[in-house]
């Protein structure tokens, strides 16, 4: 008896959160974006229709769980369920921005740990693997009982600044906006051969931050603030103002995830920040544009990760 082993095909599908990024990733991988419709019933319930056979395929579903967070998360869960019930061979949830990541631990009594809950329901829905970038807290990787590949935005941001004249300059310093971002700031600083400084802040309440001290030499320096995400932009703009007040020459900022909610755009436009560099893990095309914001694409690194996962080769090279 002859045994026939046929390799399962690769197909990429997208929810509604960031279809432009999904199309760019599919183009780089060299496959057409799969045909699936994610719509709404009249009462707002989400409906998913897969318009092609997916039996036995290696399915990659691209969906950031950005605002509206709950809608986009439910879209992803229902898509995963639909593919599982349609007998997809393997389902990888590609989540460039992982919502609810800030609720990764109890900060006071009776707090939920929603980052863990989301990991559990993604697994329960039928995801076999998760591919994401710059989780707000790296320990979230341990919340999953399925394989998770955690890509980094620092190489993309570091390359941009290195190619635009910030590499090996004595007057450049990389600034961590808080103690929790020091590791990220150090990795970024290593790429442009710069020292680091640290802002010591406190949060009297959510989305509100106050600068207490600045550790490091920033006087007459060009400072680059780096964070994993910018939400209301309070931390980054307060930090930039504090740097200038203490003698910094110029302030640039960069982040992986541009959440940009509430007063963020107004704060950035009115701040001393000369330029904000971000990645397109979140679609900000519908937000009022700003001349200060430049968006770089993560499509090449996600496309390469998808190719490596599909071909069953190491993804770790992409973490460097």
From Swiss-Prot:
Required cofactors, per record? Mg(2+)
- What are the BP-aspect GO terms? 5-phosphoribose 1-diphosphate biosynthetic process; purine nucleotide biosynthetic process; ribonucleoside monophosphate biosynthetic process
Q: Does the keyword ATP-binding apply?
A: yes
- Coiled coil feature spans: none
Q: What's a Gene Ontology MF term here? A: magnesium ion binding
**Which regions span the lipid bilayer?**
none
Q: Which SMART domains match?
A: Pribosyltran_N
The protein's UniProt keywords, in alphabetical order, are: ATP-binding, Cytoplasm, Kinase, Magnesium, Metal-binding, Nucleotide biosynthesis, Nucleotide-binding, Transferase
- Per the Swiss-Prot or TrEMBL record, the active site comprises 201
Which residues participate in Mg(2+) 1 binding? 136
Binding-site positions, Mg(2+) 2: 178
> Pfam families from the entry?
Pribosyl_synth, Pribosyltran_N
Annotated ATP binding sites: 43-45, 102-103
The record's annotation in InterPro entries points to:
PRib_PP_synth_CS (IPR000842), Pribosyltran_N (IPR029099), PRibTrfase_dom (IPR000836), PRTase-like (IPR029057), Rib-P_diPkinase (IPR005946), Rib-P_diPkinase_bac (IPR037515)
GO terms for CC?
A: cytoplasm; ribose phosphate diphosphokinase complex
**Gene3D superfamilies according to UniProt:** 3.40.50.2020
Where, by residue number, does D-ribose 5-phosphate bind?
203, 227, 231-235
Query: Where found, per UniProt?
Result: Cytoplasm
- Cofactor notes: Binds 2 Mg(2+) ions per subunit.
Q: Which SUPFAM superfamilies match?
A: PRTase-like (SSF53271)
Q: Does the keyword Chloroplast apply?
A: no
Source domain of life: Bacteria
**Enzyme Commission code:** 2.7.6.1
**Family, per entry:** Belongs to the ribose-phosphate pyrophosphokinase family. Class I subfamily.
Q: What does this protein do?
A: Involved in the biosynthesis of the central metabolite phospho-alpha-D-ribosyl-1-pyrophosphate (PRPP) via the transfer of pyrophosphoryl group from ATP to 1-hydroxyl of ribose-5-phosphate (Rib-5-P).
What is the protein's given name? Ribose-phosphate pyrophosphokinase
State the organism of origin: Clostridium tetani (strain Massachusetts / E88)
């Amino acid at each position: 008896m002859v045994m026939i082993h046929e390799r399962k095909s690769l197909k990429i599908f997208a929810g509604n959160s960031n279809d432009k990024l999904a199309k760019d990733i599919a183009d780089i991988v060299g496959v057409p974006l799969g045909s699936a419709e994610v719509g709404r019933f009249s009462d707002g319930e989400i409906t998913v229709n897969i318009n092609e056979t997916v039996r036995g395929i290696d399915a990659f579903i691209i969906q950031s769980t950005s605002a509206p967070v709950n809608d986009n998360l439910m879209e992803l869960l229902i898509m995963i369920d639909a593919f599982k019930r349609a007998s997809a061979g393997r389902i990888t949830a590609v989540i460039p921005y992982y919502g609810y990541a800030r609720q990764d631990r109890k900060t006071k009594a009776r707090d939920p740990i929603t980052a863990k809950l989301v990991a559990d329901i993604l697994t329960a829905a039928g995801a076999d693997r998760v591919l994401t970038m710059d989780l707000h807290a790296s320990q979230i990787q341990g919340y999953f009982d399925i394989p998770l590949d955690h890509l980094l935005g620092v190489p993309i941001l570091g390359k941009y600044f290195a190619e635009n004249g910030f590499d090996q300059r004595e007057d450049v310093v990389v600034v961590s906006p808080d103690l929790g971002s020091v590791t990220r700031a150090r990795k970024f600083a290593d790429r442009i051969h710069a020292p680091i400084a640290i802002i010591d802040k406190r949060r009297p309440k959510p989305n509100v931050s106050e600068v207490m001290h600045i550790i490091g030499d920033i006087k007459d320096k060009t400072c680059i603030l780096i964070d994993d995400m910018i939400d209301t932009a309070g931390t980054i703009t307060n930090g930039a103002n504090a740097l200038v007040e203490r003698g910094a020459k110029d302030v640039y900022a960069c982040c992986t995830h541009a959440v940009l909610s509430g007063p963020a755009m107004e704060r950035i436009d009115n701040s001393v920040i000369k330029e904000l560099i971000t990645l397109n893990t979140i679609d900000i095309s519908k937000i009022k544009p700003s001349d200060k914001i430049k968006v770089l694409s993560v499509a090449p690194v996600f496309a390469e990760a998808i190719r490596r996962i599909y071909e069953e080769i190491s993804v770790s090279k992409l973490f460097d």
